From Swiss-Prot:
Molecular-function GO terms, alphabetical: [isocitrate dehydrogenase (NADP+)] kinase activity; AMP binding; ATP binding; phosphoprotein phosphatase activity; protein serine/threonine kinase activity
Subcellular location: Cytoplasm
Organism: Salmonella gallinarum (strain 287/91 / NCTC 13346)
Protein name as it appears in the record: Isocitrate dehydrogenase kinase/phosphatase
Subcellular location, principal: cytoplasm
GTP-binding as UniProt keyword: no
TM stretches of this protein: none
Gene: aceK
Catalytic function, reaction form: L-seryl-[isocitrate dehydrogenase] + ATP = O-phospho-L-seryl-[isocitrate dehydrogenase] + ADP + H(+)
Biological process terms in GO annotation: glucose metabolic process; glyoxylate cycle; tricarboxylic acid cycle
């Protein structure tokens, strides 16, 4: 190879990343217009397009590099010099951390995910931890109640870049003050102030104002979801001021925010204070940088592994028919491998399962489907694998394992947030907790269906419970669009003997679903059945599902709230609006 080629390749990779991130910002910058125009289908399409940008640009760079090297193979020393040159480009580069992930992706694409060593890749960052750079403008603006909270909030709402009129700004300000007074107390409120991010966070049908509320006792989140009416007027739907509420808003089961952030690292650092329970990976994931989030997730895994003497074990719960799932006992994630052979009743291919996981990645997850990271050639130390799990791996996924002596390499797997399987949770809880779990399960089904997702297999074992008590779906092999399903009523029996027969007395075609049958496995437990009938009996009616299909086909996009209905201002303070004047 000619001398100097290493630098050219390093520069080409970095320029390719610049192009990718420029397009990322371009798509993101359209979020305000899509919100103002209520173009909700464009919102969904932009979300998918932005996810695809990264892999598309990695592919473009790989093709450029093959042209530059004339398709010739490169030796290890050459690649090390490329990385050295690339590293030298990063100290003055503002998005160094994502640029390192982009380099990793290009390398993996070129070498088919082989030889993934710290010498060749940025397994850990080459730059100082949490490195800051001079930024062209502050990320946020401070507001102090020098003349009271009403003028303070008026300034905040009036400073927003949104160009739509307000339905009733004064009313919304009173709602916010009422909430803050209830939360903090009337005496503490004058001693508090707010710092608000300059950019709005857009997702689904809302524009989120994200801020920090500084109180005498510490800093709290200050989140205002701003919606628009069908008439094009703005209103604040609620105010959220606890870290638990903020954690749910930025949760792993939700779509990525669109927030214009030329310097994502600075924004991540700013968010840490109000999201103390979120890891670096989760913060990057929440704001749409999912590929770098994968890098950070892998780093978090390596750090945990280095400090733990735990062994990998099969994950608790009912063993799956499609996926083999394992975990570390104290780690908050699980590892999922597609089995080489499925149970007979699972008539599908591994390619179909991977397509289902990709569908979830690109779709609006409405807070009810767990996000995943996909890995290839994942290395495990045999000494850290429990013998029972090793035997299971050899039995269920031998075609996906390469034995390297002291290590094994798993050809393909997913990493996903660990939750308590819902069936186990239901066995352990009673009273109000049981009631809440059944309510959550039904709400999860409804919200998925409204987002055009039919889970397929609705058994409790396919759902998990998060640390906040939310029910989330995580078994995707039978997932499909609602519009692909034929929801049918079971025809009346012709004779009494029909109901006792082993075969149905009516025809069943592929895609047919009979909601009446859900009752048999969802209500079998006498503790659960009455609760389900009380709260979710309509899920057993085919006409309920057909009505949802009609709304979807008509183009209706449902509202998705990252908080309970009872937290909405219209529910809490509805009476106030009758005397409020529009502004």
């Amino acid at each position: 190879m000619p001398r100097g080629l290493e630098l050219l390749i390093a520069q080409t990779i970095l320029q390719g990343f610049d192009a990718q991130y420029g397009r990322f910002l371009e798509v993101t910058s359209g979020a305000q217009q899509r919100f103002e125009q209520a173009d909700w289908h464009a919102v969904q399409q932009a979300m998918k397009s932005r996810i695809h940008l990264y892999d598309h640009h990695v592919g473009l760079v790989v093709e450029q590099l093959r042209c530059i090297t004339d398709g010739k193979s490169t030796d290890a020393d050459f690649l090390l010099r490329v990385k050295e040159h690339y590293t030298r480009l990063l100290p003055d580069y503002p998005r160094f951390e994502i640029a390192e992930s982009f380099f990793n992706s290009v390398y993996c694409r070129l070498f088919d995910h082989r030889s993934l060593t710290p010498e060749r890749l940025f397994i850990f960052s080459s730059q100082p931890e949490r490195r800051f750079r001079t930024i062209p403008r502050p990320l946020a603006k401070d507001f102090f109640p020098d003349h009271g909270w009403e003028p303070l909030l008026m300034r905040i709402l009036s400073d927003l870049p949104l160009r739509l009129p307000w339905q009733n700004k004064s009313r919304d300000i009173r709602y916010i003050i009422a909430h803050l007074t209830e939360t903090l107390g009337e005496d503490a409120l004058p001693r508090c102030h707010v710092q608000v991010a300059n950019e709005l966070f857009y997702r689904n049908k809302a524009a989120w104002l994200v801020g920090k509320l500084t109180t005498p006792d510490g800093t709290l989140p200050f989140l205002l979801p701003i919606h628009r009416t069908d008439e094009g007027e703005l209103f604040v739907d609620t105010c959220l001021t606890t870290t638990a509420e903020a954690s749910i808003v930025f949760g792993f089961a939700r779509s990525y925010f669109m927030v214009y952030a030329p310097l994502l690292a600075a924004l991540v650092e700013w968010l840490r204070e109000i999201l103390p329970g979120k890891t670096t990976a989760e913060l990057y994931m929440a704001i749409g940088c999912q590929k770098h989030a994968k890098t950070e997730s892998y780093r978090e895994y390596l750090c945990y592994l280095a400090e733990s003497d735990e062994k990998f074990i099969e994950a608790p719960g009912i063993r799956g028919m499609v996926m083999l799932v394992f975990t570390l006992p104290g780690f908050d994630r699980v590892f999922k491998i597609i089995k080489d052979k499925f149970a007979p009743q699972k008539e599908m291919s591994a390619a179909h399962v991977r397509a289902c996981y990709q569908l979830v990645k690109e779709h609006d997850r409405v807070g009810r489907m767990a996000d995943t990271q996909e890995f290839e050639n994942f290395v495990l130390d045999k000494r850290q694998i429990d013998p029972a799990l090793m035997a299971l791996l050899r039995q269920e996924v031998p075609e996906k394992i390469t034995d390297l002596g002291e290590h094994i390499v798993i050809r393909h797997l997913y990493i996903e947030r660990r939750m308590v399987p819902l069936n186990i949770w239901l066995e352990q809880v009673e009273g109000q907790q049981l009631r809440d779990a059944i309510e959550e399960y039904g709400n999860a089904i409804r919200q998925l269906a409204a987002a055009n997702i039919f889970p397929g297999d609705m058994l409790f074992k396919n759902f998990g419970v998060t640390r906040h008590g939310r029910v989330v779906f995580y078994d995707y092999d039978e997932i499909c669009y609602m519009t692909e399903v034929n929801f049918r009523d079971i025809p009346p029996a012709r004779y009494p003997e029909d109901e006792l027969a082993s075969e149905p007395w009516y025809s069943v075609s592929p895609g047919d679903v009979f909601p009446e049958e859900f009752r048999h496995w969802l209500c079998a437990d006498p503790r659960i059945g009455p609760l389900f009938e009380e709260m979710h009996a309509d899920l057993f009616r085919a006409d309920y599902w057909r009505a949802l299909q009609t709304r979807i086909k008509e183009g209706h996009v449902e509202d998705v709230y990252a908080y309970r209905r009872r937290q909405r201002f219209s529910v809490r303070y509805g009476a106030i609006s009758s005397t409020a004047n529009s502004s």
